[in-house]
Amino acid sequence: LAIDPDSMSSLMASDCLQHYQLLLTRILRYRDHTLSPAEEQLLAMQAEMSGTANKTFRQLHDADLKFGFVENEKGEQVELGNATFSQLLISPNREVRKTAFHQYYDQFKAHENTLAATLCGSIQTDVYYARARGYESARTAAMFPDNMPATVYDNLITSVRNNFEPLHRYYDLRRRLM
């Protein structure tokens, strides 16, 4: 990235770098979003601090939330947690599934303010880094590594929104039958 664009174009045109053309093109896309060495150093120094929201969520989710126990279809008490939740949701016994579902998500409801604060912190971090690097938005910055146009994202969201009804009918039918 430190090589001036004209020199880099000449280098990339050479036969010896043809094998690395795609890799170099991907790297060079970041030129407009790369800061001066001093500015990059400042961003690097706050990397650990910017991960606080994610670390807080991981600690809450992986260590602090206690989901209790659920009686499975065999009458055994099973500790409800991230590892057992999906297993209990496929139980043939409707009451086991219902209890596991509500008991699991009740913990998230009980900690909704903490979860909201961690989400807010994560969003603020994304917005800060996007602005610092000169992206139009945090969404644009998130899609940049995959070279995905915003229209692809927008079309996906529109398509999902327009097709919720069949999914809702499926879950309603499933709820009634199971």
Where are these regions (language model features)?
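A well-structured
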Residues: 1-178
